[in-house]
């Protein structure tokens, strides 16, 4: 596998995270699908060789599925990133998405000196982590845990809401439909979005995701109109 394959994979994944903006399985599948559609044939072939011929979409939520198993329990904290009040990255001593993503990228780039299983698992992690680091509920500001709200009588915290319900309660699309609706950038726009490093993308994500604390106040009671409002005001790639 050429280094270009992993660089291209992480770059194209970053392009489509802001468009989905609330994850769960459908969101992760949509991000991976759109990214896959923008891979070069050579990069796609190289990646799928390590994945046993499977699509990256197949493994988009794999990291969520294995986090509760004994072998991967140590990855529980590796889905989120903490930032300070100004949105600056604060590394977690227990590990976080950014530290783990950097490690996975380094291993895939060094594929000649890694066994196939290490490269394979690292690719699976990259596909998931680039999505996680762009999700509003996975950017942890200092006041992160204080935010709980009720929506039509059901209580949510922001992590739970943006992980699953932001998509489930708005458009009930399949990941292919998200691909058709959101994969509309020009080549120039794609290049601009994919510029920088994962740490740059985290800084952008922290800045863009802070708005959720303006939309939803702690202990606020909301109706489903709020779901429609957040959906209509989300950034798009069109």
Describe the predicted segments one by one.
Residues 21-95, 101-104:
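An N-terminal structural lobe/cap that precedes and organizes the functional/catalytic core
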Residues 230-236:
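Conserved small/polar residues in nucleotide/adenosyl-binding loops
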Residues 24-26, 113-122, 222-227:
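Structural motif
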Residues 143, 148-229:
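Domain-level detector of nuclease and nuclease-like folds
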Residues 1-8:
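Bacterial N-terminal signal peptides that target proteins for export
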Residues 69-165:
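Acidic/His-rich structured neighborhood in mature extracellular/periplasmic domains
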């Amino acid at each position: 596998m050429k280094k270009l394959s992993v660089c291209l994979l992480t770059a194209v994944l970053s392009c489509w995270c802001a468009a989905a903006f609330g994850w769960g399985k459908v969101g992760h599948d949509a991000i991976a699908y759109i990214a896959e559609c923008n891979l070069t044939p050579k990069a796609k072939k190289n990646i799928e060789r390590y994945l046993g011929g499977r699509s990256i979409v197949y493994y988009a939520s794999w990291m969520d599925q294995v986090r509760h198993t004994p072998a991967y329990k140590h990855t529980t904290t590796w889905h989120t990133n903490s930032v300070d009040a100004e949105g600056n990255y604060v590394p977690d001593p227990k590990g976080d998405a950014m530290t783990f993503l950097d490690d996975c990228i380094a291993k895939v780039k060094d594929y000649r000196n890694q066994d196939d299983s290490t490269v394979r698992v690292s690719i699976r992690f990259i596909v998931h982590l680039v999505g996680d680091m762009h999700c509003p509920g996975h950017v942890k500001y200092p006041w992160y845990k204080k935010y709980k709200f009720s929506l039509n009588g059901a209580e949510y915290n922001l992590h739970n809401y943006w992980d699953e319900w932001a998509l489930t309660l708005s458009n009930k699309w399949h990941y292919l439909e998200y691909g058709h609706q959101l994969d509309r950038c020009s080549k120039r726009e794609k290049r601009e979005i994919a510029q920088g490093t994962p740490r740059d993308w985290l800084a952008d994500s922290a800045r863009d995701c802070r708005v959720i604390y303006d939309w939803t106040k702690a202990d606020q009671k909301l109706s489903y109109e709020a779901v429609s409002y957040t959906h209509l005001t989300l950034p798009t790639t069109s």
